[in-house]
Structures are given as C-alpha cells and as structure tokens.
Amino acid sequence: MYNSNSYIPDLVEIQRQGFFYLLEKGIIEEISKRNPITCFEKQIEIFFYPQYYRLTKPFYSIQQAIFYKKSYVSKFYIPVQLTDRKTKRIFLKWILLAHFPLMTNRGHFLLNGSARVIINQLVRSPGIYFRENMHEIFSNKWSEKPSTTFRRFYADIICLKGTWLRIECDKDFSMWAKMKKGPKIPLLWFLLGMGLSEKYILNSVYKPMNLLQSFTKEMEKMQKSKSSKELKYPYISSTKQAWEQIQKLFKLKKTLRKFSFLKKNEEKPKTFIFGQSSTKIEAKVVFSDFAAFNNSVKRENTVFASNDDTFLVQTSFETKKKKNTRKKENFQKNKTQKTTKLSLQNKEKRVASKLEAYELGRKWFANKFMNPRTYDLGKQGRWLINKKLGLTIPLEQTTLTALDVLTATDSLMKIEDGFFEIDDIDHLKNKRVRTAGEALQEIFSIGLIRLEKSIRLKLNGNGQQSFFQKTSFFNFDSLMSTRPINGAFREFFGTHPLSQFMDQINPLAEITHKRRLSSLGPGGVSRDTATLAIRGIHPSHYGRICPIETPEGKNTGLVNSITTYSKISFHGYLESPFYKVYKGQVQRNLGVFYLSPDKDDHFQTATPDLNLTPLGFLPKKPIPVRIGKRFVRMKTHKLALMGVSPLQMISVATSFIPFLEHDDANRALMGSNMQRQAVPLIRPERPLIGTGLEARVVSDSGHAILAKTSGYIVYSSGSKIYLYTI
C-alpha cells in the first residue's frame, strides 16, 4: 500500500510547464530572431514588437470544439511597424499573424475535434562531448586478432541548428577539424579562420606541436598534388578546385581527346591533343546554363570563344546505330550532354594576395559557425559548453566562438595524457527532454521563416511601389498572411511522428500517454539501427525513467515513461527528489532536494524503505548505499541523501501493480502495458486490492469532478453534489 509523507507532484505538469514557457519566452525569442525584415534595397523595413503580442479568447470552448469538430485555437495578434525610408513614412498596426493552438488544462490539444498529445522527446543535449576511438591494425587480411591496437580521442560539438563539428586526433597525434560533408582540414587552419592569431593559438594549447603536424602534412600534400598536376596536364595551369570540377564535369580521362579553342585576335582555332601540348592556360570555372550550339558526330569536346575572355565547352554523345533495324542510315540524333561556360584569364590578373584569401576564409567560417541564422547552440548548449570547458561566455551567445574551439582543443590534448575522463553518451546528464513547448517553438520558427520569405517576395517584386502610394492600410495588411504559420502548425499536428492521437481508453492510459518519453522522431535515433546500449537501463535512470514500463518489440527501450516523482528542470534535464541526511538524521522538515543527473555520481544515496526512529535517525548498522554505478554498504554518518518513496523509481502505471516486488520483471512489464487497455466499468467501484494512487490518477487526468474550494459534502446524487464551505 502506498504510504509516504512526501507529496506527489502534478502528473500533467510536464505538459503544461513546457507550453507555459512557450507563451512566456519562446514566442518572443523566435520573433526577435527575425527582426527586422527588409527589402533588397533596404528602403522598406518591417519590425515586430513580440513583447506586446496578444492572444484573444477562443471562439469555441473546449466542449464546443469537441461537439462541432473544430479546433481549440486563439487568434494571435502582434503590433507591426512598417517604415518607408524613401518617403519617410511610418505605419503601425496590430496584425493577425496566426491562429495559435491552445493547450487544455488536461495537457492536450484539440484539432478538428480530436484530442492530440505531443510526446516528450529524449535527445542528445547540444554541447561538447569527448569520446575515444579504438584503432585496430591487422598484419594481413586473414589474421583473426589485430597486431596493433591504439586509442585516440575526439570531441564532438553538437548544435541545435547547423553543422556538427568534430575535432579529432589521428594515429600520429595530428589535430584535424572535420564536418559531416567535406574533407578534414588542419585544426590550425580552422582556428586561424575563426580570427585567432598563430602566436596566440600556439601559446594557449597544451601541445602546440600536434597542431603544426597536421598543418605540415597538408602543405606537403598540396605541394605533391600541385607538382603532379603540372606534369600530367602541361597545357593547363589552374587552381586545384577548378581542375577537379573540369574532371568531374567532362570526365577528361575517358572522353576528352582534343581541346579546340579560339583565342582573341586569332582567326583559326587551335587544337591541342590531350596530354601533349605544353601551352599553359589559366582556367577558372564559372557555372551557367547555355544552350547547345553544335552537334558533332565525333566523340570530342570543342571549345569556341564567346567574347574576349570566355569560351564554351560542349560534350556530345557518340553517334550510335539504333537496335532492331537492318538499315545503316538510321542513327540516333546527337544530344548535347553538358555545356558549361569557362573563363580564360591571364596569369597576372588572377594572382590573389594572401590577404584576400584570408578574408574569404574568414567569411566562410563566419557564415558557417558564427551566423545566428545558420548556426544555433541554444541556451542549453551554451550552458553545457561553459560548464565543461570552464568558460564564462553569456548564454545569449548561442553561436560558436573561437574561444570554444581553442579551449576544446586544449582539453582534448589533456585527455590524451589522462587529465580528464571521457563522456558517457548514455548518461542522462548528456541527454535532455524536448517538451511540447519546444516542439511548437520550432514549428513556429519554421512558419516565421516562410512568412519572411513571402514578405520579401512581395517587397522585392514589381509592385513594390504600390504598397505606399495610398494612405490606407489595405495594402499593408496584404503583406501579412496567416497561411505560412497556420500551414506549419497544420503540418506538424497532422504528420509529425511526435504528434499522436490521445489514448483515451481509461484515465491511466491518458496520463501515461502524456508522461511518455520517446527517443524516436526527428533528431533522435532510428528503431532499426538503435543498439542495445541505447535501449538498456543506465544507473542514471534511477528515479527519473522507469526501468519496467516500455513497449515490446522494436520500440523496446526507445519509448519509456517518466517516474512518478520526477520533474523536468529549466535546462530540460530529468530531476529526482531526495531528502538531505545530516549525521545520520533525515532532514524531512527541510523539504525535498531535486538532484540533476550530473550531480548524481557525487552523492551517497540511501534507499527510501529504511526504518527510521521517531526523530528521523537511520539505523546505526551499515546500510546499502548507491554511489554512481556502484552499490556498497556504508555507515549512516557518511550518507548525504535518501530517497523520498519506494515509488520513486517506477512510473505511474507500474505503481498500480500490487506487491510489485514479488513480481517477475517481464510479467510486470506486460502488466503495466495491459492496464492501459482496460475499459471502464458501467458501474464504477473501488478495487479490492489497490496501491493508493488510483484516486490521484483519476483526479489529475481530469475525468473526475474537482471542487474549487474545500468543504463538506452534504448531498450527492447522479445529477448534482452539494458542498458546504465556511
């Protein structure tokens, strides 16, 4: 039987808390990122004031929305200022931006009369993670065991939006920066491109020679490729990228036999046979679409000049005979395979200075990692990076900085020598919960991007002047449309895998659905490729994720339930309540202390089912204690924390099973899942054997009638209840 002095938190608070954060801060953050919207010439500026937005009273109540099969939404109004710099006129008006879906008191949404629930998603928290990689070298392909095995470490910088960055160390201890797409580059180049000086970089890291090794390797590789290119193709001298594009486009080794081009002030075109001419021509690839200008029966590439410094290259298919015919005259028509435009320039014109190349590199890095529109760590990611690397960068700085990469490089070098430990990616301190509010905030951001594109299209169109020729606000209203944001919400609730039709078989099924935790969906793992390490039970799950309730089949371990007492912190981490213990006495009068997963490994935690004296003292004999992953026996005066209830480690559905400690784990899993499939009785009655949580689940689910004030019930019937209050 359930018996505890601790108070069970609201079972649907997780859903309401996420939506409340969206209304309080999330909407303002997303609109502020898009301010202001300007046209191409920046003569017209549109500015939103998100802190003054208003939501109207819903047109349909909850009961009416269900009865008429309508949506429970509110009109979203926001003040918008439009400034015309050319005529120096300012317009300010409240604009209807969208029909915003509202959450009911029971923690779900109503769309077209149907109740829908947004599942909480458990994903890897944005930040930095240090991992190890085992390299095995076999003496030959038939050997069973590797002849040499060595460890190397790497760091992953994960973001909410943008490109993931990996800093790795190869077998020669050279440092490289690597992205998902593209080749790896020396880490020294990466740091230089982010704006740091070479002297500052080498003086700030633990082992500067590791940075110089990768830099030296890349320079030697470039010198070799440059010398071999000039010997193999003596008639052309171009940048490496230009030559690779020419090879990719025209497959020179297979199809090109002759190069014919017409230079300026020459009458006849010169023809160069592939690989034999010694004439050098500076080439730079310029991509553009051109119509076919020649069809040649021969398999060759022909080049003609189109103006002073450009020429066209055309590749044509070889003429082939049609199949299933005896006539020799029937041939297929020639079709141009590819036509592209190349520009010829003198060597003196295209010599770029080192300063220009440096500025181009800086622009690329700034757009890739320092632009808030293309890269976003989020406040949680910035907080985690600051905590791990010991930085004090403000939480508002959600893009990557040069100091982040430099400090991560220094930490990675120290991990090689054993100064720090690597991260456990399955630990809950490296995972966070994306609530319903965050999912809606992301969809709202997508709708704002669509709205911004439509506004820019209208402002940059031919009818740009028509918006400001009249003094009426009619044309100003036509700039704004509710379709982009409404369409984004409609797509999310209709097609997103985390938006599900609410399970309404019984009150327990409804509560469990709203407290579900899924690792699937966009940004998560796939059920087909998830390993046992992801599905398994981790010691950090204690008091946070139920080890029993999970589906059977492919979703085992990927879909879980939050425990009865757990709650979600501001940063999205699952926290579990504990009592503080001082010199063997449990300090219940101080209330509960919520412990985050990152602090779980540093405290000695006792089980909550110990017998206490009337004054709250623990037994004097050694008791079982958990310290991180280990279970030991320890004297009570060394304890720091104690659990609040035996129900702390299991979910709501599992806590409905009487005498759970005598049940087999596999049967308990099936029982917790099958309880949600029970249909309600026509004549409700109390269970013969219960655990004491039944009434709480019914009240929190919203199925029971709740009195707004306390008092005495003086009369009750099937139609009314009289409550007497003082």
Curated annotation (Swiss-Prot):
SS bond list: none
Class of this enzyme: transferase
One GO term describing the cellular component: chloroplast
Miscellaneous notes: In S.obliquus the gene for this protein is split in two.
Assembly behavior: In plastids the minimal PEP RNA polymerase catalytic core is composed of four subunits: alpha, beta, beta', and beta''. When a (nuclear-encoded) sigma factor is associated with the core the holoenzyme is formed, which can initiate transcription.
Function: DNA-dependent RNA polymerase catalyzes the transcription of DNA into RNA using the four ribonucleoside triphosphates as substrates.
Protein name (database record): DNA-directed RNA polymerase subunit beta N-terminal section
